[in-house]
């Protein structure tokens, strides 16, 4: 799908201020993303999610992340994620490739 190394750079620039990916990583403003792929929304243990996030009821995967990362507030109205989104599909694909790799270790 995307390029893991390019995705890592995007994560560092746009996501790492609020999220960690490593197993056992701490929650920041946003939840630790380890184990993200295949998990339902609002399920990272120990993180305080909005009801909107908990009630969305989708499972994170390539397709759901592709849509969410384009415009988080449109995909989950009421989310507390303040990130505006990534408009370029190729950049989202790179980020998702990195997340698939980094959050599964």
Curated annotation (Swiss-Prot):
Gene3D superfamilies: Cytochrome c-like domain. Keywords: Acetylation, Electron transport, Heme, Iron, Metal-binding, Mitochondrion, Respiratory chain, Transport. The lineage of its organism: Eukaryota, Metazoa, Chordata, Craniata, Vertebrata. This is Cytochrome c. Signal peptide: none annotated. InterPro entries: Cyt_c-like_dom (IPR009056), Cyt_c-like_dom_sf (IPR036909), Cyt_c_1A/1B (IPR002327). One of its GO terms (molecular function) is electron transfer activity. Electron carrier protein. The oxidized form of the cytochrome c heme group can accept an electron from the heme group of the cytochrome c1 subunit of cytochrome reductase. Cytochrome c then transfers this electron to the cytochrome oxidase complex, the final protein carrier in the mitochondrial electron-transport chain. Binds 1 heme c group covalently per subunit.
